[in-house]
Amino acid sequence: MIFRIRHLILLCFFLFFLGFLILPLDNEWVQSPYGQSIYPNIAAVNHFLWSKVPFSIGDLGYAIGILLIFIRLKRFKFKRHIGLVLTTVFVIISLFYVCWGMHYFKTPLRVSRKLPATISVEHLKETTQHYAHALTALHQQISSDPATAIVTPLETDALLALATSTMEHSSLRPSKIHGKAKATLFPNLLSYMGFGGYLNPFTHEAQVNTLQPKLRVLTTACHEIAHQWGIAAEDEANYISIKATTASEVAVVRYAGHLLAFQHLINSLYRADAQQAKAVLDKLPEGILENIREVRAFWEKYQNPFEVVFERSYDQYLKANQQQAGIKSYSLVVDLLVDDYINR
């Protein structure tokens, strides 16, 4: 009897998964019934269950799951257990899309805003200069020494609470959804994998790698909370993070947001016209350059041969979920920032 029930469950999830792959999803259905009604209720349940827990339930669940897999491998027999394995895989994939993954099928912001396929170097330069000027003004407001990098004395819990508060009070927040950032239990692992954070799609916990420079912890936490809101596209999560932080009443949060935006913009400008990018950088106070170097030095510290494997795997994951630019999707936020600036 148990054998038949297992096969019935497997058949149901297989048909769901097959239908999901074959049938094109209606963007309007994802954005309206799912995005406006179904997902907010799922998010509310997860927020109620896990937001008060001071550590990451999702990380703990992954660790236990991986441990159980290694234990079971010793007794694994292909013919006997293949049905259970397939059932588990189909259940996990199905739950992933039902709990959160459907958001990948929303109409992209760049499509709804009718962004051009390319942006001019002139517009890119103007936008980069705009953020450079704003960043310089904020640096002068926070520090009297132009040669000193901006630092915050806040510890991890206070940083994450500040990021959570920033997003909670943002005018961009969906009315029915609340977010909260948590420190991952495995920051060293994420660092070696090259990840600043991630959203657990099952528990909806916004996990942050708190080993990063503190200013980047702030913007990463806001990025992951944007994912909690149902923003799946990486460029859009970056955009929401930047818009929320640059509108904050707290100067150091505004600085962190402008710094993130500037780093994406200056990297794009450097690829388009290295001379113009260098001209912009030459006018920046040394303290801002120190903040930029701090982020670069952190990631260089954790570079390793396996990082490429993780990046390629994540690149394929993103491409399989409607983000054709793959891991380069993060930098596509530049298009949204330039569009904002030229249409201000």
PLM region descriptions:
Residues 143-210, 214:
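Auxiliary, metal-adjacent structural segments of Zn-dependent hydrolase domains
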Residues 15-73:
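Membrane-embedded alpha-helical segments of integral membrane proteins
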Residues 288-344:
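Pan-zinc metallopeptidase signature
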Residues 122, 131, 232-276:
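Post-HExxH zinc-binding segment in Zn-dependent metallohydrolases
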Residues 102-171:
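Membrane-interface segments at or immediately adjacent to transmembrane helices
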Residues 54, 217-238, 242-243:
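Active-site recognition of the HExxH zinc-binding catalytic motif
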Residues 62, 67-74, 78-112:
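Transmembrane alpha-helices and immediately adjacent membrane-cytoplasm interface residues
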Residues 1-11:
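N-terminal membrane topogenic signal
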